[in-house]
């Protein structure tokens, strides 16, 4: 069967990003919405072996059950195996003191990871598209994110695959219209309660009145920023101490590569940001490093770590390890 333009675009994107292993098979996260329905049908059409997985979070009453039944009917018609699970999302959110959105995300990805292991799937395909990438970049820009956040959504993260990142939401809708395929609509996506929805319904359309190519241009910027992130991650990996992942070890970071970097603050943040040092603290540490004495002897604390400047290194010590040492001395 001949592939249409969208299917061909997706297949080329999958091949370019090495998402499809020989003889592998994949799980498609199927909500019943337009994006995931299109993803399922496209992957089936290009010959990618797939099974579907649906999560019922019981957040929208009868609408949640409607979505599940839609997925059951669709997979039966297409001859695709469907895995289903039900979650008490409200209880999980309350127990773990997280938002409903975060609870659903945690539950979803934990389930997908376990399911992939149970059925030996090679990857989990999720239906993020180019417009999701644009929204994510803008969200992270509003939050003051660095390159990591502005790089937005990666095509692949471990065994999580995003084959639709190369097409737009409108491409998805056009594909479904061409196939005469229906889908369900999550009524909460039409509300303006969430910041993402406000960006989707108001801010991005406004940007398009200023420049009709706004979505394409922002998505292209995200691509360039992802490439910059990969380069910086490789530099950071070269600088990372071998014991940096040991929860009880003192972490030693040489000053020299930071001081020789074209953007010293940026490199410092890449080195110590994961330990809870951000914003003004980064600026203050950098000011100290630039002093004639190199800031030797100065100390800062984050929620979990203490950073001290030595003559040639930054010493990062877990506060937990300091507490344990203090207890040993008292004993």
For each of these PLM feature ranges, what is it?
Residues 189-196, 215-226:
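Internal, active-site/partner-interface "lid" segment
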Residues 136, 202-205, 267-270:
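Alpha-helical scaffold segments in soluble metabolic enzymes
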Residues 92, 115, 207, 271-272:
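Broad structural signal for hydrophobic residues in well-ordered alpha-helices, predominantly aliphatic
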Residues 143, 147, 208-212, 230:
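Alpha-helix boundary/capping and short turn/kink residues
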Residues 200-218:
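Conserved anion/nucleotide-ligand pocket segment
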Residues 142, 208, 272-276:
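Hydrophobic/aromatic-lined pockets within catalytic cores
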Residues 2-202:
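Core alpha/beta nucleotide-donor-binding catalytic domains of modification enzymes
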Residues 2-35, 51-55, 87, 107, ...:
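AMP-forming adenylation/ATP pyrophosphatase catalytic core
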């Amino acid at each position: 069967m001949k592939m249409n333009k969208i299917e061909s675009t997706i297949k080329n994107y999958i091949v370019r990003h090495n998402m499809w292993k020989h003889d592998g098979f994949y799980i498609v996260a199927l909500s019943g919405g337009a994006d995931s329905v299109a993803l399922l049908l496209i992957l089936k059409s290009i010959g990618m072996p797939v099974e579907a997985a649906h999560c019922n979070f019981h957040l929208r009453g009868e609408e949640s059950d409607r979505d599940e039944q839609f997925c059951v009917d669709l997979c039966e018609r297409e001859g695709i195996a469907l895995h289903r699970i039900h979650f008490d999302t409200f209880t999980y959110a309350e127990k773990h003191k997280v938002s409903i959105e975060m609870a659903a995300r945690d539950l979803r990805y934990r389930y997908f990871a376990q399911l992939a292991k149970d059925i030996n799937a090679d990857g989990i395909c999720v239906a993020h598209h180019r417009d999701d990438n644009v929204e994510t970049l803008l969200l992270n820009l509003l939050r003051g994110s660095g390159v990591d956040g502005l790089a937005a959504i990666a095509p692949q993260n471990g065994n999580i695959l995003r084959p639709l990142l190369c097409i737009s939401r409108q491409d998805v809708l056009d594909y479904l219209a061409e196939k005469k395929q229906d889908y369900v609509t999550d009524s909460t996506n039409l509300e303006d309660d969430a910041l993402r929805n406000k960006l989707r319904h108001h801010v991005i359309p406004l940007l398009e009145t200023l420049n009709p190519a706004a979505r394409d241009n922002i998505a292209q910027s995200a691509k360039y920023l992802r490439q910059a992130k990969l380069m910086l991650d490789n530099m950071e990996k070269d600088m990372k101490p071998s014991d940096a992942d040991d929860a009880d070890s003192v972490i030693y970071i040489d000053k020299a590569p930071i001081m020789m970097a074209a953007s010293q603050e940026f490199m410092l943040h890449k080195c110590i940001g994961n330990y809870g040092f951000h914003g003004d603290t980064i600026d203050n540490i950098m000011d100290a490093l630039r002093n004639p004495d190199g800031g030797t002897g100065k100390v800062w604390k984050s929620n979990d770590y203490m950073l001290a400047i030595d003559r040639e290194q930054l010493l990062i010590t877990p506060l937990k390890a300091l507490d344990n040492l203090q207890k040993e001395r008292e004993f």
